[in-house]
Amino acid sequence: MADTYGLSCDPPRGWQVAVMRRPGTVPPAAGARIAVAVEQDVTRPVLHACTRSMPADRGDFGSGVVELLGPDDVFVALVDYGTEVADQGLFEKQGLPRLAPSQFGPNRLQRPLPGRSASQHFFSSGGRAFCLFTVLGSHARRMASVPRAAALVKTLHITDRASLAREGGHP
């Protein structure tokens, strides 16, 4: 998959992957100087990956698709929180997390969905802050589903802030 917004993925067979940014104000290029600070709604890129086809209309954390997951399906969202909060507080951990079945639970979903399970990890990579949100179609089948999710996560590539600045990209 081509690198879009500094996010790319080489998914295992059977995964659908999309990178998008909602309409809104694009943040300044990494390293750009801003003359006057103005409060604006800034949108950031989101990478979605799923073992089933995804509807075009879906939320950043998978609303519109996680409800459709079958018992063997997996959904992954990599949500960019920007450079301003990277490497500190909630985003202090470095690098993509390793997924394990023990990290998943039905109570980790944004709202209750019978039978499903999720995990959520906050981290930084290359001066950028992220949330990795993963939903399994069946909590009971997490021992089989988590390795599939982990295989996808291993193929994620995040372009660091400095490289984006050199290339004139927008995180």
What positions do the PLM features span?
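Secretory pathway targeting signatures of secreted, lumenal, and periplasmic proteins
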Residues: M1-D87
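Residues that flank catalytic or metal-binding motifs in active/ligand-binding sites
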Residues: P11, S119, L152
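Surface-exposed amphipathic alpha-helical segments
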Residues: W15, C131-P171
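Glycine-rich loops and low-complexity Gly/Arg-rich segments
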Residues: G24-P27, R33-V36, S102, P147, ...
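Signature of long, low-cysteine stretches enriched in small and polar/charged residues
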Residues: A56-G127, V135-L136, A140
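Short, isolated positions in well-ordered beta-strands
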Residues: L7-C9, R98, F130
